[in-house]
Design a protein with these regions (language model features):
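Substrate-recognition/cap regions that form aromatic- and gly/pro-loop-enriched pockets
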Residues: 358-494
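Bacterial N-terminal signal peptides
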Residues: 1-7
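Accessory, solvent-exposed terminal regions and/or long lumenal/extracellular loops of proteins
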Residues: 290-375, 379-381, 460-472, 476-488
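Short, charged, surface-exposed loops that flank catalytic or proteolytic processing sites
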Residues: 159-167
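A contiguous strand-loop segment
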Residues: 16-148, 169-329
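Second-shell loop/turn segments in exported
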Residues: 138-142, 151-160
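Histidine-centered catalytic/metal-binding microenvironments
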Residues: 468-597
Length: 598
């Protein structure tokens, strides 16, 4: 029997929004996988490039613990980003492995953030933490499990060129050596990965199984002409155990559910439902996952009406697993979807008192009082505390080096600019490898976007238009760069020298965007400092909107100056008259400015 003690559950763990677009659902035959890394506290915002390597027979690979705060790793095993002195004290202690497994002869080059992102073969991964009915702890931390999903994704990057290889490799390691989730509770104790190569895309769910130091897992193929989403909760329902083309799973998937009373094979519970059996539902609050799923599907196909309300997301199954889009999907569509805060719906987060006078969609956590004041804000796909978002694009008709594109957006998606990073990169632009949350760094791409996004809160409804204009300009330039490079390599393989020239063009683009964003911060400061909107923008000052003044208690503020008992005060000015002072008194404090216009 599984017992959940709600009082012990954390209010929120890392929570990520993801999309997967089949090649038949995109504008040009690309597959897309996305991921928003929605961290909090002291995130490690750095990207790292891990080069390809050959390994001696009999070598072993260290297995690293699940560390996501800064620094997530210190050492030489995972690229130059994590060398001591790069964003951490030069005397920082190196990260200690929690185990080892046999190494393979050759490992592929790849980029990573908190998880493996894309390798040189265009294998691509996105992640979304989920709740589960079992909890396991890591080896050395009160448990025996060796693998977190972060490490599994890295090993898949190192060893696999296809999604099926990645699923089988990660699944076998998890069941053989044990799997543990992102938190030591049922809330956030399981995981989902979205995995794509140049041909197909899959969704894979992991559940720890501490009873035998193992895991339960399942994977389902996304139809080529459809789009699926995962928003911090399992989505796979029925599993066809006789359809290896579309399903992969651990051998214990049914036995564990039956043993622990999670599914009755007699027929009482109906068809086996993986989510109903193994999910522990939404975490943080009701609608935390389901509302985002509803919001995403309304973007994918606005013509299909779905109900934003439901009873129990785990039981009710109110939304489709995947959906045909209303129109073919592009990278820019996915940028926009990750910037969604339910605009033009009853849940629009830029509306109402919580949005403030300037319509900010961002909501911060409550203070200590939240433990005694029940309540929640809506959670949208766009989130102010996102560490980074990536939109991964795979294209099998081009050489891997430039066919795979990581559209990388540091910090919150609604404030970032997505820049293209090709799969064949040999060294990351330095600006993407720097990001310490405790120190503003003008060499850091992440800090440029974080800085501007926070400045925009001064007058968000106005400043966001400046940000959108910059996003459109620079993301269009990035798309033009990708198209120009594509044209050079469409015929197939190219010389290493030509590839190096192309990669240098991408690095130069990243640096141009970083410089432009720091300039944008200066523009926003000049336009909206001290509560004003500069005359260069509007030609007139802009004060608080009337609806917000009413909500904020403007009418209950200090009273106007009381009228004199016997006429006005005798106030003289050169060439003036006695009645001027009386005019000021009669006007009242709210009209002083007009009274003093002489």
């Amino acid at each position: 029997m599984i017992v959940v003690i709600a009082a012990l559950l954390p209010p929120e763990v890392h929570a990520c929004s993801t999309f997967l677009v089949g090649k038949g659902a995109s504008v040009d035959g690309s597959l897309f996988v996305t991921h928003s890394d929605d961290g909090e506290g002291d995130p490690d915002a750095r990207l790292s490039f891990i080069p390809a390597a050959d390994h001696a027979p009999g070598a072993f690979r260290d297995v690293w613990p699940d560390l996501e705060d800064n620094p997530r790793f210190v050492g030489t095993a995972r690229g130059e980003t994590y060398l001591p002195g790069r964003g951490v004290p030069s005397d920082a202690k190196g990260t200690e492995p929690i185990g080892k497994i046999p190494q393979v002869n050759h490992t592929y080059a790849y980029t990573e953030g908190n998880y493996g992102i894309m390798n040189e073969k265009q294998l691509s991964i996105g992640e979304s933490t989920c709740s589960g009915r079992f909890v396991a702890n890591a080896k050395g931390s009160g448990g025996e499990a060796l693998f977190c999903v972060n490490e599994l994704s890295r090993i898949a990057m190192e060893r696999c060129a296809t999604a099926r290889c990645a699923i089988r490799t990660m699944g076998d390691l998890a069941t053989e050596h044990g799997f543990y989730g992102a938190s030591g509770s049922f809330e956030g104790g399981s995981e989902t990965l979205l995995i794509a190569d140049t041909s197909e895309g899959w969704v894979m769910h992991f559940v720890p199984y501490p009873e035998t130091n193992s895991a339960v897992w399942v994977a389902k193929r996304v139809p080529d002409d459809e789009v699926t989403v995962v928003m911090n909760m399992f989505t796979i329902r029925s599993v066809n155990l006789k359809d290896p083309e579309n399903y992969m799973y651990s051998d214990n998937i049914i036995d564990v559910a039956v043993k622990h009373g999670l599914w009755d094979p007699s027929g009482k519970d109906g068809v086996f439902d993986f989510t109903k059996a193994y999910s522990d539902g939404e975490y943080a609050h009701k609608y935390y996952s389901g509302r985002r799923a509803w919001g995403a599907f309304r973007l994918i196909n606005p013509g299909i009406e779905l109900d934003p309300n439901y009873g129990d997301l785990r039981i009710d199954d109110p939304y489709p697993w995947s959906m045909k889009p209303a129109k073919p999907v592009s990278a820019s569509d996915l940028f926009a979807w990750h910037r969604d805060w339910y605009q033009d719906t009853p849940f629009d987060m830029s509306k109402g008192v919580a949005a403030g006078p300037w319509g900010s969609p961002d909501r911060f956590n409550g203070c200590d009082a939240e433990v005694s004041i029940p309540g929640s804000f809506e959670r949208s796909i766009a989130l102010h505390r996102t560490t980074y978002t990536h939109v991964l694009q795979t294209r099998g008709w081009l050489p891997d080096a430039i066919g795979g594109i990581t559209w990388y957006g540091p910090h919150a998606a609604h404030g970032t600019c997505f820049v293209p990073v090709p799969a064949g990169i040999k060294k990351l632009p330095a600006a993407l490898t720097i990001g310490n949350a405790t120190l503003v760094d003008r060499d850091s791409q992440w800090w440029a976007h974080r800085y501007v996004h926070n400045l925009a809160q001064m007058k968000y409804a106005y400043a966001v238009e400046d940000i959108r204009a910059a996003q459109a300009m620079w993301e269009n330039e990035g798309a033009e760069l990708v198209a120009a490079v594509d044209a050079k390599f469409r015929g197939g393989a190219a010389s290493p020298e030509a590839v190096d020239v192309a990669l240098g063009m991408f690095e130069a683009h990243v640096d141009k965007v970083r410089a432009a964003w720091w300039r944008l911060g200066d523009v926003i400061m000049a336009n909206y400092a001290d509560g004003f909107v500069s005359k260069a923008k509007t030609g007139a000052p802009v004060g608080y909107p009337a609806w917000w003044l009413e909500a904020a208690g403007w009418r209950q503020g200090p009273e106007p100056i009381p009228p004199p008992k016997t006429g006005g005060s005798k106030i003289f000015r050169e060439g003036g008259s006695l009645e001027w002072g009386a005019r000021v008194r009669r006007a009242g404090s709210a009209s002083l400015a007009s009274a003093f216009r002489v």
